[in-house]
Amino acid sequence: MNSKLSLSTKLSSSGKTQLAEYFAKPPFKVITLPSYDDAWANGLNAMQMSSSPGVLAGDVLEIDISLAKLTALSLNTQAFTRVQAMNEGDSAMQTTHILLAENSRLFYLPHPLVLHKDSVFKQQTHIEMGEQSELIYGEIVAIGRVLNDERFAFRQFSSHLKIYTLQDDGKKRPLVSDCIQWLPSKMNLTALSQMENYSHQGSLTYLNLAKNNAEIKQQVQALQQQSAEEKDLLIGISQLNEYGLMVRVLGCRAEQIQKLFEKIGRLLKSV
């Protein structure tokens, strides 16, 4: 199935973020949510939904998100995405394109991916950031249905994240390039420095083009202090070369990583 979700934002006359254009091809759907207490006071809260039982063999999913100048969007998902079992030679793919205009802000934290036995899933995420824009983007993936004794029973998982800043001359300058490639039949993914005995991995990328390295360093230190209180999680926080930081987490419960990323998101929104 070829499925597509496309949405863009605009600023209302009262200075609040609204949906400008919205198109969804099943099983995708987006609903807007009431405004809750949030550091992004004029932002829009929305939920990405799906009527499908999961990602199936041959599925091609495309997501396009475009934020207008001065708008802010917090986008979550409804539930876990399950990548279902596939026949040998089959696969599914998702491509996400995100464009952040000048002074726009996006928080995007999909629920975890669960890789079922014999599944193959490839995803690519491309993000372009305008001047002084801000991004909080998370990914969480489970190595299988652990309670069903499925650990690394999938065939392949790959995730490529590329983030660029748009320069005055129209050219794109790379800020982040991150790649996860898991091939259980060819890799020892339980080895030291890999997944070891953990069953879930999470990555959270934060970029704020309005902040300098000294300000980012303060945020890294604050998050490191906060993460010291977390139990049963292996957490690493690194400052990027410029404008941001990355959090990498290993754990045994998806909900624990999800709540941690939501907590970090609230903190980053407020500074």
Swiss-Prot record:
Short name of any one Pfam family annotated for the protein: UreD
Primary location: cytoplasm
GO cellular component, as recorded: cytoplasm
Location in or out of the cell: Cytoplasm
Record key words, sorted: Chaperone, Cytoplasm, Nickel insertion
Parts of the chain that traverse the membrane: none
InterPro entries per record: UreD
Function: Required for maturation of urease via the functional incorporation of the urease nickel metallocenter.
Family in the record: Belongs to the UreD family.
The protein's name: Urease accessory protein UreD
